[in-house]
Amino acid sequence: MDFRELRRRLVAHLRMLVRSGDATERGLARLTGVSQPHMHNVLKGKRVFSLDMADQVLAQLHLDLLDFVEPGEMMERQRRR
């Protein structure tokens, strides 16, 4: 797994939050300090999250990158070492 995959999973999680009504594009934009149109484009895949934006949204939502790693992926990584 690479950072692009983790970023893809983070964006998918944010899309799910918006679809379920637990967050709004505007609210996510405020958390990261970007405009709502910019956040919209990030969620639609037209723009990518910068590292700073990803860090901010993770911190504000009390998430960690490990929240986006499946247990089986961790076990596979341990086996390869």
Give the positions of each predicted feature.
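Short, charged recognition helix plus adjacent turn
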Residues: M1, A59, V69-R81
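A short, Lys/Arg-rich alpha-helix, primarily the initiator
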Residues: M1-A23
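Residues within the helices of the helix-turn-helix
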Residues: R15, R26, R30, D55
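Short alpha-helical DNA-recognition segment
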Residues: S20-N41
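Short linear motifs centered on Gly/Pro in flexible linkers and helix caps
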Residues: V34-P37, L51, L63
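The DNA-recognition helices of helix-turn-helix-type DNA-binding domains
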Residues: S35, K46, G72-M75
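Short, basic-rich loop-to-helix N-cap that marks the start of a DNA-contacting helix
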Residues: K46-A59
